[in-house]
């Protein structure tokens, strides 16, 4: 493959940036409120926006800021009492601003620019594109994409806007969704603020209420401030909502309890049209462990054998018999449905009664089926108490209830006149009796001693409705078509699309299956074949009118058991139908007992037994449901394959992640001072006492943060010297130079809202209402303003929130204003929240189980499939040449041109593949890192020696499969020379390496622990040190709940064993049961599991391999002349950065990599550590809850771990501190500033693999595999005589480096901008026209003068560490461009945030009272 990056055409790369203006200067005026009038700035903003929606205006505290571009005039507020308002400060600034901490006027300018764009998009779209948080949501089609336009000013003067889209599954609320079944599965948000809220029922009848008093005021304010015009909307519905004040303050609710109702009672009225719902991801019901329909090869062969047997036994069909119409024949015919089977068919009858296809799922299942429920080796108490006749009944319990004549399927349509009296066949009465008896048994029998597990009982219809609302995984091209030019967004993005009636009609095919498929006779079928082929669409549209796929349960034909879904036996053969009933009756059977079996009369055979339309056996109703659902090979229309995606935007809000929100909307506490907010509605530090909130998520909550208190100090406005901006272009270490008073020192960096807020309601009300009445609502008279200001009420509490006389709780507009002027960033909303959420119990000092769970997730080689948690990613826009966005932007700005790669990229180069150390024939050698798939062929061995251990697999199902898996894994481990794996044999009765338990109850687990202690005690005398014991626990389902359950089981065993023998080391490895049972698992996968076990055994810092040190290609010698020149450069640099103490020496002896992240709800901290070669690696998880002290302790531990690794290095050390998710909050930065010292040079980096900035590759020739993907003829033939001249390359591991011309702002901290930006990119395996897989790297400070060289060094370090992903088991090669330690943090974060944590022996438990589906083991 060609690696000459110079041949790549950067002009064929499309960025997500659009140039809108060329900036020479930006003018600003600052107006400070006079006479302590808190409302004046808000009034002026509304007046200016009413006069011209294109006005660039923003608020900060009590100040009003007005901006203009280049020579445009700065907007001026209306005069008061005929006196013009003069600005308190006038200034200009250019694109040459300081970094990384942006000046306050620049942040406010970006905020004003964003508001201007969103307001005009809403006005131009006629409410089809309205603001939602710091984005806008499209209401013109499904799904409702979130579109984000982020402005940024490059150093060269280009004012640009980046464009991206995101699908979080948000759907607008409708009146029919106001029911508990919908609300219990969706999180609700207010628009345009994006604040989390809950619905409050107005009465027992429903949620809708009468419009409030100030309806016109609220709607007018929406129109002025956001361009959302609902004043002319007919039948506008109103509901009472309970807003989450914690989210208003910047605290995201606990993700693991995201749907837990609030205890607050504060309500306000909001239009139903501006409420959006986000569906919960139901992992238990939507995840299948194996995407294949067959778990193993035997299932596939059995299915084929069933068809063959069915075809062969068709020869025994005898015309003329009927077990339904003739009672005499039914009683004596050995082949009838009630007679005894002959010896030739006895085994078929037994198989059909005692088995059912393991891979078949009934459409009426409501519980999750675990493998042990239908394991042939499971002999639980449920089965032992069932008689054979009882075991027969459940085979029919999942049959759809179709309200049709049961004999109708056994006759022609013209002959279906049989009386219902003939329906009472012995088969049916036996079924009813068995159903009743089995129902009694199941109600009385329970698994004694077993650990209780709560099954999810949600209907399939609700599941389908939820799945339709979940984000769908579409290709980039589909997203672009829907958003920017095609499909249903004609008005929004330009192009039109045809109706999707074809899709709807096709959908009915899969949704409903009717009796027409089964009742059609051969004659009808042959006659209709032509018409079916010609009118396929019409036929499919008519399907499902008679018998729906989900039958009605109002009039059931048979007695069924609700909630009973267990399969009591294994496979069930297809030959469940009595053979004589497979043909229509014509003559009676010949009944001579001594005669041979009758043979079928020769006649025309059917074309093929496998043809779905030609093969139409006559099936008695409720006998077998596999044909009703399409057969064993069918797929249920409910089962939708969800993309295993996840990426949660981890943006801190409570202390400093709010800075994104502050920068975007300026609605900090100072903004809310300008609102008439009642004292009981004011966010405050004592929110839990004022609002009766006792939930843990509100502990230590503080009020809304202020830009004035964090990054934008009021003093900075007065001390900004425009002339100093150009002299301080890049403060390389200015990230550490934040003034001490800029960073809050309190428990929380949020500040309480000033209690001296003056009411504004009557002021705003009179202004807006009077202007609403007049013919020209944009005119504001000075007298009106003056009179309103003088007549403000003196009561600080404002007007009461509720009007006592109004039974529907009419709310005043003062309660609504905070939720109008506040705009929450999307980073404060979790992309995914799941159900059910497991519970894990920890103590204040011991959190080892969290690291245990994290270790299973990190090193799984993706066999856990991300535990079924979806992934939400930003999507790039391929084309935006027409449509609403382009039209609006051209109206607002002079141009709207897309920037290409050559406009944004300064350096594009192919990065060399690193080498790793391995052993071959007892010699240490270096090989390229992409040789990992060939380990078993090349006989590579770990260079750091072997690791021995003892293995024990604990299982409660599929004993035979586990019995073969344990020795196979052990032998694989030994054959790869990873060490010796001994299969633990605790008792003489148990096979080596396997302990089979019927249930994991605590008594049995304690007995097992005692056996392990006894075994170790006996063997300790013979050997000095007992090797580590690895306990393997199969996962019945690859879900987070199941993983936590198994971790709790292991923790019980470990605690008991370590209490008796502290020196014994126990380790856990979880493997999906589907992996164990699948006979098609390759040797490569067994080798990967063996290597992952090797990596987790002690010492954990020693992995299978590490990066090999490469000698430099050239050595630079310094002469005296060069040294003098370098000293002069250093002096110049010192003068430029006199406050940073930067050094021009750029060489470091060692690099240490520390990656960390914090969850959106700020309750989790994750970290991973490594050196440049992957040695000394470790991962760590902390649950800090809402405690600031625990977070500080976690930071201290992170720093101590880094210093411990640094103490083992020599020379000059650079610690690369990496924060995930493109954000660096102030409180975290304050910790690193406090902990940093002179011994270690600190380079702060923010990274993100799911950034808002995207690049689309349209080059067709580079890399050289693109033409081959387009046409295989471009690939040359291999010359077998020159095999040594060829090189095997894994294009997934072919990484390129990029250095951008200009630095980018942080994705979720836009008051900070990098001093240098770069990326690692990977080309997708196709012929082009795709978005790069990009790993963005933003350097925030530089310990020396050359930031570009430091960035390139960091990119090279990251590229080397990314080569260890496959070797360490973090991925199967997909994420070859992400360093292993960053990928480890990402995997831990995306999983553990969905786990509820219970702190033992603590009154302030952080788990809610909701029931849990995990095991909680406790002594009773």
Curated annotation (Swiss-Prot):
Which ranges are annotated Acidic residues under compositional bias? 655-669
Q: Name one GO biological process term.
A: negative regulation of transcription by RNA polymerase II
Chain positions found as Phosphothreonine: 601
Ranges annotated as biased composition (Basic and acidic residues): 429-439, 454-484, 670-683
Q: Reported effect of changing residue 608 to A?
A: Loss of function
Q: Which GO terms describe its cellular component?
A: CKM complex; mediator complex
Q: InterPro entries per the record?
A: Med13_C (IPR009401), Mediator_complx_sub13 (IPR051139), Mediator_Med13_N (IPR021643)
Keywords for this protein? Activator, Nucleus, Phosphoprotein, Repressor, Transcription, Transcription regulation
Residue ranges under compositional bias (Low complexity)?
A: 494-508
- Point out the coiled-coil segments of this chain: none
Q: Where is the composition biased (Polar residues)?
A: 416-427, 440-453
Indicate where this protein resides in the cell.
Nucleus
Q: Phosphoserine-modified residues are where?
A: 370, 375, 425, 608, 636, 748
Q: How is it modified after translation?
A: Phosphorylated. PKA-dependent phosphorylation at 'Ser-608' is enhanced by activation of the RAS signaling pathway.
A single MF term (Gene Ontology)? cyclin binding
Region described as Disordered: spans on this chain = 416-511, 653-691
Q: Which family does it belong to?
A: Belongs to the Mediator complex subunit 13 family.
The record describes the protein's role as:
Component of the SRB8-11 complex. The SRB8-11 complex is a regulatory module of the Mediator complex which is itself involved in regulation of basal and activated RNA polymerase II-dependent transcription. The SRB8-11 complex may be involved in the transcriptional repression of a subset of genes regulated by Mediator. It may inhibit the association of the Mediator complex with RNA polymerase II to form the holoenzyme complex. The SRB8-11 complex phosphorylates the C-terminal domain (CTD) of the largest subunit of RNA polymerase II RPB1 at serines 2 and 5.
Name of this protein: Mediator of RNA polymerase II transcription subunit 13
Protein source organism: Saccharomyces cerevisiae (strain ATCC 204508 / S288c)
């Amino acid at each position: 493959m060609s690696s000459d990056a110079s041949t790549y055409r950067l002009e064929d790369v499309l960025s997500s940036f659009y140039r809108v203006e060329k900036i020479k200067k930006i003018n600003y005026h600052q107006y400070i409120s006079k006479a302590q009038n808190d409302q004046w700035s808000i009034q002026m903003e509304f007046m200016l926006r009413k006069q011209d929606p294109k006005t660039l205006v923003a608020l900060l505290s009590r100040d009003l800021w007005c901006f203009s571009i280049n020579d445009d005039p700065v907007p001026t507020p209306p005069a008061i009492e005929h006196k013009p308002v003069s600005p308190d400060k006038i200034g200009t600034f250019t694109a040459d601003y300081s970094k990384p901490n942006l000046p306050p006027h620049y942040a406010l300018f970006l905020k004003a620019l964003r508001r201007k764009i969103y307001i005009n998009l809403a006005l131009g779209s006629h409410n089809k594109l309205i603001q939602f948080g710091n984005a806008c949501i499209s209401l013109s089609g499904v799904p409702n994409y979130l579109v984000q336009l982020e402005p940024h000013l490059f150093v060269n003067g280009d004012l640009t806007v980046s464009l991206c889209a995101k699908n979080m599954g948000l759907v607008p609320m409708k009146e029919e969704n106001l029911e508990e079944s919908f609300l219990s599965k969706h999180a609700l948000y207010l628009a345009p603020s994006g604040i989390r809220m809950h619905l409050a029922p107005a009465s027992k009848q429903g949620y809708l209420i009468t419009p409030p008093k100030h309806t016109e005021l609220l709607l007018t304010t929406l129109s002025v401030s956001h361009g959302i015009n609902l004043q002319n909307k007919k039948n506008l519905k109103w509901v009472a909502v309970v807003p989450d004040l914690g989210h208003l303050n910047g605290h995201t609710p606990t993700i693991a309890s995201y749907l837990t109702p609030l205890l607050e009672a504060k309500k306000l009225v909001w239009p139903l049209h501006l409420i959006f719902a986000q569906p919960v991801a139901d992992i238990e019901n939507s995840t299948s462990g194996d995407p294949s329909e067959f778990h193993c090869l035997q299932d596939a062969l059995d299915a084929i054998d069933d068809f063959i047997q069915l075809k062969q036994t068709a020869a025994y069909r005898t015309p003329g018999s009927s077990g339904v119409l003739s009672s005499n024949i039914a009683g004596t015919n050995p082949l009838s449905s009630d007679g005894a089977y002959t010896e030739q068919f006895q085994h078929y009858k037994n198989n059909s009664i005692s088995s059912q296809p393991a891979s078949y799922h009934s459409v009426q299942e409501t519980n999750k089926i675990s493998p042990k429920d239908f394991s042939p080796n499971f002999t639980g108490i449920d089965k032992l108490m069932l008689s054979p006749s009882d075991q027969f009944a459940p085979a029919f319990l999942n049959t759809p209830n179709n309200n049709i004549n049961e004999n109708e399927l056994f006759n022609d349509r013209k002959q279906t006149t049989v009386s219902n009296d003939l329906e009472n066949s012995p088969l049916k009465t036996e079924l009813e009796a068995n159903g009743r008896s089995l129902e009694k048994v199941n109600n009385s029998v329970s698994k004694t001693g077993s650990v209780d597990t709560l099954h999810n009982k949600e209907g399939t219809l609700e599941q389908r409705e939820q799945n339709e609302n979940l984000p769908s995984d579409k290709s980039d091209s589909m997203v672009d078509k829907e958003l920017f030019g095609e499909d249903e967004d004609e008005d929004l993005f330009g192009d039109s699309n045809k109706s999707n009636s074809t899709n709807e009609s096709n959908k009915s095919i899969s949704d409903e299956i009717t009796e027409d498929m089964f009742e059609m006779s051969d004659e009808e079928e042959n006659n209709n074949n032509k018409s079916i082929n010609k009118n396929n669409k019409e036929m499919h549209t008519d399907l499902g009118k008679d018998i729906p796929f989900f039958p009605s349960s109002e009039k059931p034909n048979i007695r069924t058991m609700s909630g009973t879904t267990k399969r009591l036996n294994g496979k069930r053969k297809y030959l469940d139908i009595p053979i004589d009933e497979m043909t229509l009756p014509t003559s009676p059977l010949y009944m001579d007992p001594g005669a041979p079996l009758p043979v079928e009369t020769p006649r025309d055979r059917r074309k093929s037994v496998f043809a779905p339309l030609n093969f139409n056996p006559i099936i008695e109703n409720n006998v077998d449901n596999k044909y009703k659902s399409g057969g064993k090979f069918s797929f249920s229309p409910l089962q939708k394959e969800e993309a295993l995606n996840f990426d949660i935007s981890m943006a801190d809000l409570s202390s400093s992640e709010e800075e994104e929100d502050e920068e975007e909307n300026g609605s900090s506490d100072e903004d809310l001072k300008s609102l008439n907010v009642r004292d009981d509605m004011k966010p405050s530090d004592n929110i839990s006492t004022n609002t009766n909130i006792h939930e843990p998520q509100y502990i230590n909550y503080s009020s809304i943060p202020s830009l004035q208190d964090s990054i934008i100090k009021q003093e900075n406005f007065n001390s900004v010297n425009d002339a100093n901006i150009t002299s301080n272009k890049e403060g390389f270490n200015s990230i550490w130079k934040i003034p001490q008073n800029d960073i809050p020192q309190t428990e929380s960096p949020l500040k309480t809202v000033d209690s001296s807020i003056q009411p504004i309601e009557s002021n705003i009300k009179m202004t807006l209402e009077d202007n609403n009445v007049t013919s020209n609502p944009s005119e504001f008279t000075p007298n009106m303003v003056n009179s309103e200001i003088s007549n403000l009420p003196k009561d600080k509490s404002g007007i009461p929130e509720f009007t006592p006389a109004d039974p529907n709780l009419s709310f005043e507009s003062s309660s609504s204003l905070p939720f109008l002027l506040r705009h929450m960033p999307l980073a404060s909303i979790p992309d995914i929240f799941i159900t059910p959420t497991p519970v894990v119990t920890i103590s204040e000092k011991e959190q080892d189980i969290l690291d245990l769970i994290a270790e299973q997730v990190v090193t799984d080689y993706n066999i856990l499939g991300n535990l079924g948690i979806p992934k939400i990613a930003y999507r790039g826009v391929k084309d935006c040449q027409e449509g609403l966005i382009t039209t609006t932007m051209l109206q607002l700005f002079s141009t709207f041109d897309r920037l290409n790669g050559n406009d944004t990229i300064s350096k594009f180069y192919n990065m060399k593949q690193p080498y790793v150390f391995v052993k071959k024939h007892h010699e240490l050698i270096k090989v390229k890192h992409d040789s990992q798939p060939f380990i078993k062929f090349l006989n590579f061995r770990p260079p750091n020696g072997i690791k021995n251990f003892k293995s024990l697999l604990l299982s409660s199902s599929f004993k035979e499969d586990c019995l073969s898996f344990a020795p196979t894994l052990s032998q694989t481990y030994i054959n790869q020379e990873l060490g010796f794996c001994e299969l633990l044999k605790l008792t003489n009765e148990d096979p080596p390496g396997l302990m089979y338990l019927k249930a994991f109850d605590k008594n049995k687990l304690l007995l097992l622990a005692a056996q392990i202690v006894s075994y170790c005690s006996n063997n300790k005398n013979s050997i000095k040190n007992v090797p580590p014991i690895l306990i393997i626990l199969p996962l019945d389902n690859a879900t987070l709940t199941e993983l936590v359950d198994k971790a709790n089981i292991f923790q019980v065993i470990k605690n008991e064993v370590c209490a008796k023998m502290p020196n014994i080391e126990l380790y856990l490895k979880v493997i999906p049961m589907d992996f164990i049972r699948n006979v098609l698992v390759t040797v490569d996968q067994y080798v990967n599991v063996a290597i992952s076990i090797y990596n987790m055994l002690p010492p954990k810092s020693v992995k299978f391999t590490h990066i090999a040190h490469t000698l430099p290609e050239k050595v630079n010698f310094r002469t005296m002349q060069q040294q003098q020149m370098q000293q002069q450069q250093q002096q110049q640099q010192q003068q430029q950065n006199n406050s940073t103490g930067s050094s021009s020496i750029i060489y470091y002896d060692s690099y240490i990599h520390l990656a960390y992240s914090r969850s959106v709800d700020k309750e989790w901290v994750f970290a991973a550590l490594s050196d440049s070669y992957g040695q000394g690696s470790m991962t760590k998880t902390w649950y800090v809850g809402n405690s600031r002290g625990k977070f500080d302790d976690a930071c201290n531990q992170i720093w101590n771990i880094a210093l411990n690794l640094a103490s083992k290095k020599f020379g000059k050390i650079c610690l690369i501190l990496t924060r995930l998710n493109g954000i660096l909050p102030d409180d975290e930065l304050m910790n690193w500033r406090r902990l940093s010292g002179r011994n270690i040079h600190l380079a702060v980096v923010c990274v993100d693999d799911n950034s808002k900035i995207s690049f689309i590759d349209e080059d067709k020739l580079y890399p050289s595999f693109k033409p081959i993907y387009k046409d295989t003829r471009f690939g040359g033939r291999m010359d077998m005589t020159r095999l040594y001249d060829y090189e095997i390359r894994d294009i997934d591991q072919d990484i390129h480096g990029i250095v951008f011309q200009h630095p980018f702002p942080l994705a979720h901290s836009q008051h900070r901008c990098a001093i240098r930006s770069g990326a690692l990119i990977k080309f997708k395996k196709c012929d082009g026209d795709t978005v790069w897989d990009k790993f963005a790297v933003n350097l925030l400070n530089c310990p020396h003068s050359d930031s570009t060289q430091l960035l390139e060094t960091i990119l090279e370090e990251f590229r080397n560490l990314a080569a260890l992903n496959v070797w360490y088991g973090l991925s199967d090669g997909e994420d070859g461009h992400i360093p292993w330690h960053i990928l480890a943090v990402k995997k831990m974060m995306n999983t553990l945030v969905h786990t509820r944590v219970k702190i033992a022996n603590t009154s302030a438990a952080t788990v809610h009272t909701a029931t849990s589906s995990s095991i909680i083991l406790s002594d009773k």
